[in-house]
């Protein structure tokens, strides 16, 4: 009998400690799982499409096999795309060391002989397409919000009511239309040149803000300027029958912007051209509120990186590294995911790579002893970094030459791609503490930073300077103490002994010294891979920055094995057809976003009005986040609830489920249920989840094997470390949602996000849509092209990319008929080649390979530096921007460098004033809550959008709480016991799995389950909440499904045999009649009882700087329930 890899792994996981098993049986394991490969030939009766997966957000390539079944095309199989840099090709000759994709120029007929690796999630994408709970027609609420009652409406009614307003007939509620908020349209209909008016109005607002920030101007002068503004524009608008309040949110606060800002577009999972498309739409509406779910994704990691590097996504090159420190980065989950990270495991198993896996949970493989688990206490990652940095400083394990270069030109002249600010001097006392000493401060007539190089000089006047300096300098303000940026870091590291740092983080002292020695041997070809486990804490940005100081010290940046950002991509938005997200004639917009990201409180009129009245401007009503690179779920909902900084009238939410995916996101139900705070809520989705249950309108969307998220996308850092990489996603099958019309150019339109936004834009007459709405650029300069449907937009994108790739020499000048014929016979999108006839042959070449990719071996110069352009000039050990930024509640300045700070609230609960709040362990001491719950990701499931993965659910039908054996023994807990986890916000019951794969004092509950709404509703019984208001809303949930049968379930169209194959373990009521199958709503999520910030009205806990959701710090105690549950250890797969 040949043991399959899947069967073997299932058996392997049954062993309590996989690492112990592997240690003794590695040779046997190697023989058992060594696969046999045969050439895979194309199906003679089917189609093959190379596209991109969206089982998670890693963006691997896929090969989709489509065949005829019962007269209908169906997806039969999904495997890996061998051309894609993540999947890596497989052949009989490459059964190990599978590190490379197929060469990009491999003819498609040859490429079809090979396959690429792919994880289980990618293979089970079939069940996302064929999901009985999918919505296929537009729906309208037919009862109170949250009742679960919806009725089908026509596409035309949907568009008309969203634009002009509608009525919930069953309750009598009036729903506003977007037309009421479309300031550009209101001005245009009145006969104004809308953008001329808005542009002049914004200039006037800017002038008001200049007066506000001028210390010589009084409160009276400021109010006079505002009154003059109101008088001017009331008169101008009145000439054509308009009032100022028809255009502005609040004429007394003109800095808040136009009424268009009262529309929020919030997306959950985003992909390249879906993102560009609806960002373009939001800007065409004139709103600043295009928001993303990043606070629930990796925003702490992003914000931390942005501070020190100027770019948000930076990781170590896993292909060229000799050593990796994976800190808070989960094996098999983080980019490049289970598929791409197979390369890390394989390199480690082959002895080419050493990995230290610093995480509260184990990696579940030792790779022949080369992946070493370093258990750590949640939230103490900066303490670990400080211990390691201290040893590196003590032993001189750093690149002093690299660190000494004071400016970028000098560093590049010496062969480095950039410099650090290690030598820049920081003022260390007085009101300007934390700011850089500038040339003008000491009479040098320059605003450049000052360094010490035998004397005090500006950094641009010398090549090298002292990296360790602590002394005094005479300034215009008197004698001041100054320190170099690296001196400050060194002193922070030496503020505690290695033993004291280890006492905080729980890491063995000997391990710190061991890692330091391994760094010495591997530098500079080593680096850190950091992610959610370190970043998604209140102190997350400081954690990330402290860890990245390891990389800066050894000078590994922008080189093989070291830190790199994302690969570049083609000019896919503006090579020939200008489809970029801005500068297409959109309305002028201004004002702070509702979540206040990238905007300082000190730049608001609210702040300056208070200050000029002589009031303390602090606290602000909610925090502002000037240094975060992206947006926040929690602060969006808090802003809506508190109407701060202004009320919101309409929310369009796409591909999202914040109620379940955010920590304590159940609080958001209060906002979603309240029609006075949120008058219009539109959901664009494939099914009705826990958030969309409260929507007024449901727009059916397509998924990624259809037109959903089609287009081109970059890959996350390091993008396999190549110079250019992008996937091209095109449909494998045509959409199963309703055909809603034909565009004027004869192309079919299917119900989806794409066509909904286009049709709304056409009805509102938004700029950038319709006849001649897309301008030609480059070779097409002066020409205009139509935008009436999704196919036109996407074909312009593919044409742009293909022609740029041709210009770069990646797509050949002459494309063979064989390549074009393959695409025209296999790809549904080929039927729209008429849109880009001149570029079609080159588009076909890229489509045939699922994207454009370069090769790793061509991506570095002879010295090992990346051929990519460096993303920045300088990286930072100290940030003046952060040191000058203030906590919006206390008004205190943030600390401007890497530092260990305990996880804490945003503001102190008492009278103390500082830039961070009360430590959480003071509020929730270990004596009351001895455990911390963490929610690691699962290699099988993706947060809370994986319930349709039928095959995966058979492997892992529910999740569990993993508890360390020593903790379990003290509590008398065994695997299979149902335990009660009690947190400050509530309690949940979950089955226990006793394993040594989690650090003592920590409980791990893999996320991805615990659902209660997905078109059908199954009232949750596994948790109880302490918040009476939220608990009452949960108790009001309906139980069951009340959707019309013709509104859902595209599976009914399939051949009976195909249905039985797809759903082998389910009653036909599940796939024919929307019956509730128990596996769909099994398991738990710890998010419902996660921590809140008691200093901010009990909203979900966030990071201080980036507003990231805090997932990995849930204080808890454990109680036995006396109940047991049948529990199969082979199903412990996380």
Curated annotation (Swiss-Prot):
Q: What is known of its domains?
A: Residues 7-17 are sufficient for TtrD recognition.
Q: Is Metal-binding among the key words of this record?
A: yes
Q: Where is the 4Fe-4S Mo/W bis-MGD-type domain?
A: 46-133
Q: Explain what the record says happens when changing residue 20 to Q.
A: Does not affect TtrD binding
Organism, by scientific name, is: Archaeoglobus fulgidus (strain ATCC 49558 / DSM 4304 / JCM 9628 / NBRC 100126 / VC-16)
Single annotated GO MF = metal ion binding
Q: From which residue to which does the signal peptide run?
A: 1-31
Q: Where in the cell is it found?
A: Cell membrane
The protein's job, in short, is: Part of a membrane-bound tetrathionate reductase that catalyzes the reduction of tetrathionate to thiosulfate. TtrA is the catalytic subunit.
What is the name listed in the Swiss-Prot or TrEMBL entry for this protein? Tetrathionate reductase subunit A
- Could you state one GO cellular component term attached to this entry? plasma membrane
């Amino acid at each position: 009998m040949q043991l399959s890899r899947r069967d073997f792994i299932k058996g392997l996981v049954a062993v309590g400690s996989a690492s112990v098993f592997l240690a003794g049986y590695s040779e046997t394991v190697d023989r058992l799982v060594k696969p046999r490969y045969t050439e895979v030939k194309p199906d003679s009766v089917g189609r093959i499409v190379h596209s991109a997966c969206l089982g998670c957000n890693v963006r691997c390539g896929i090969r989709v096999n489509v065949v005829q079944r019962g007269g209908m095309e169906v997806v039969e199989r999904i495997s890996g795309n061998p051309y894609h840099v993540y999947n890596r090709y497989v052949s009989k000759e490459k059964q190990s060391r599978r590190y490379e994709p197929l060469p990009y120029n491999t003819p498609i007929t040859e490429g079809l002989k090979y396959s690429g690796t792919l994880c289980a999630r990618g293979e089970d994408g079939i069940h996302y397409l064929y999901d009985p709970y999918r919505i296929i027609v537009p729906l309208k609420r037919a009862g109170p919000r949250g009742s679960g009652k919806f009725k089908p409406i026509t596409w035309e009614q949907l568009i008309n009511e969203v634009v002009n307003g509608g009525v919930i007939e069953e309750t009598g509620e009036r729903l506003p239309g977007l037309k009421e908020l479309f300031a550009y349209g209101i001005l245009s209909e009145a006969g104004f040149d809308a953008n001329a008016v808005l542009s002049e109005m914004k200039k006037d607002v800017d002038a008001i803000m200049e007066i506000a920030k001028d210390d010589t101007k009084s409160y009276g002068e400021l109010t006079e300027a505002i009154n003059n503004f109101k008088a001017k524009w009331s008169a101008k608008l009145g000439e054509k029958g308009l009032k100022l309040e028809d255009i502005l949110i609040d004429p007394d606060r003109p800095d808040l912007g136009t009424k268009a800002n009262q529309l929020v577009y919030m997306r959950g999972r985003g992909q390249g051209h879906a993102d560009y498309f609806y960002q373009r739409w939001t800007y065409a509406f004139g709103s600043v509120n295009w928001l993303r779910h990043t606070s629930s994704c990796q925003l702490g990691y992003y914000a931390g990186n942005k501070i020190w590097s100027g770019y948000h996504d930076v990781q170590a090159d896993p292909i060229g590294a000799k050593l990796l420190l994976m800190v808070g980065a989960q094996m098999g989950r983080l980019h490049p995911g289970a598929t791409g990270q197979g390369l890390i495991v394989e390199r480690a198993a082959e002895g080419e790579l050493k990995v230290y896996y610093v995480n509260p949970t184990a990696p579940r493989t030792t790779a022949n002893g080369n992946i070493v688990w370093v258990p750590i206490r949640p939230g103490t990652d900066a303490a670990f970094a400080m211990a390691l940095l201290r040893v590196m400083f003590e032993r001189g394990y750093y690149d002093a030459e690299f660190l000494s270069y004071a400016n970028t030109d000098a560093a590049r002249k010496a062969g480095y791609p950039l410099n650090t600010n290690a030598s820049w001097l920081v003022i260390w006392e007085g009101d300007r503490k934390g700011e850089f000493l500038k040339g003008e401060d000491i009479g040098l007539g320059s605003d450049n930073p000052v360094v010490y190089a035998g004397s005090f000089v500006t950094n641009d006047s010398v090549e090298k300077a002292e990296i360790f300096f602590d002394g005094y300098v005479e300034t215009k303000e008197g004698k001041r103490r100054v320190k170099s940026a690296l001196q400050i870091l060194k002193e922070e590291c030496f503020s505690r002994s290695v033993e004291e740092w280890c006492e905080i983080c729980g890491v063995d002292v000997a391990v710190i010294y061991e890692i330091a020695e391994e760094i010495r041997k591997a530098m500079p070809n080593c680096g850190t891979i950091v992610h959610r486990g370190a970043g998604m804490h209140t102190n997350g940005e400081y954690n990330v920055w402290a860890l990245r100081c390891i990389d800066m010290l050894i000078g590994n940046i922008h080189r093989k094995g070291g830190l790199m950002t994302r690969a570049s991509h083609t000019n896919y938005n503006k090579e020939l057809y200008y489809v970029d997200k801005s500068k297409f004639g959109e309305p002028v917009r201004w004002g702070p976003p509702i979540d206040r990201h990238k905007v300082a409180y000190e730049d608001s009129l609210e702040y300056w009005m208070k200050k000029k009245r002589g009031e303390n401007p602090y606290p602000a009503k909610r925090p502002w986040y000037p240094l975060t690179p992206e947006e926040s779920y929690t602060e969006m909902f808090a802003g809506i609830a508190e109407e701060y900084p202004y009320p919101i009238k309409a929310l369009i939410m796409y591909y999202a489920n914040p109620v379940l995916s955010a920590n304590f996101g159940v609080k958001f139900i209060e906002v979603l249920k309240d029609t006075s705070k949120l008058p219009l809520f539109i959901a664009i989705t494939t099914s009705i989840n826990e958030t969309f249950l409260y929507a007024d309108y449901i727009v059916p969307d397509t998924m990624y094997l259809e037109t959903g998220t089609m287009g081109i996308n970059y890959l996350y850092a390091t993008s396999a470390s190549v110079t250019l990489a992008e996937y091209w996603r095109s449909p494998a099958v045509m959409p199963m949602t309703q055909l809603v019309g034909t565009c004027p150019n004869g192309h079919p339109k299917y119900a989806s996000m794409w066509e909904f936004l286009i049709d709304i834009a056409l009805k509102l007459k938004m700029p950038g849509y319709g006849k001649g709405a897309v301008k030609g650029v480059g070779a097409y300069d002066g020409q205009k092209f139509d935008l009436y449907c999704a196919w036109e937009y996407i074909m312009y994108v593919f044409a742009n990319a293909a022609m740029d790739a041709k210009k770069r020499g990646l797509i050949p000048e002459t494309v063979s008929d064989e390549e074009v014929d393959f695409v025209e016979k296999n790809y549904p999108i080929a039927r729209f080649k008429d849109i880009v006839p001149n570029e079609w042959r080159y588009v076909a070449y890229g489509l045939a390979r699922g994207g454009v990719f370069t090769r790793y071996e061509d991506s570095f110069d002879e010295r090992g530096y990346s051929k990519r352009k460096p993303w920045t000039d300088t990286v930072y050990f100290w940030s003046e921007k952060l040191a000058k930024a203030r906590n919006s509640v206390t008004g205190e300045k943030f600390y401007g460098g890497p530092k260990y700070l305990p996880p804490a609230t945003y503001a102190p609960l008492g009278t103390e004033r500082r830039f961070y709040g009360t430590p959480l362990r003071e509020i929730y001491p270990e004596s009351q809550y001895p455990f911390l719950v963490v929610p690691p990701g699962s290699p099988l499931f993706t947060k809370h959008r994986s319930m349709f993965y039928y095959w995966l659910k058979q492997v892992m039908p529910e999740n569990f709480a993993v508890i360390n054996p020593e903790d379990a023994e003290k509590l008398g807990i065994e695997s299979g016991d149902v335990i009660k986890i009690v947190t400050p916000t509530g309690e949940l019951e979950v089955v226990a799995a006793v394993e040594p794969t989690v650090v003592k004092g920590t409980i791990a509950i893999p996320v991805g389950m615990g659902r209660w709404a997905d078109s059908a509703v199954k009232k949750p019984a596994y948790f109880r909440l302490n918040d009476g208001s939220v608990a009452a809303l949960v108790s009001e949930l309906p139980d069951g499904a009340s959707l019309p049968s013709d509104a859902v379930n595209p599976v009914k169209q399939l051949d009976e045999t195909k249905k039985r194959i797809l759903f082998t373990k389910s009653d036909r009521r599940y796939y024919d009649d929307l019956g509730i199958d128990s596996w769909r709503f099994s398991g738990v999520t710890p998010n419902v009882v996660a921590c809140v910030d008691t200093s901010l009205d009990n909203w979900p806990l966030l990071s201080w700087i980036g507003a990231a959701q805090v997932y990995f710090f849930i204080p808890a105690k454990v109680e036995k329930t006396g109940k047991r549950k049948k529990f199969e250890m082979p199903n412990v797969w996380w």
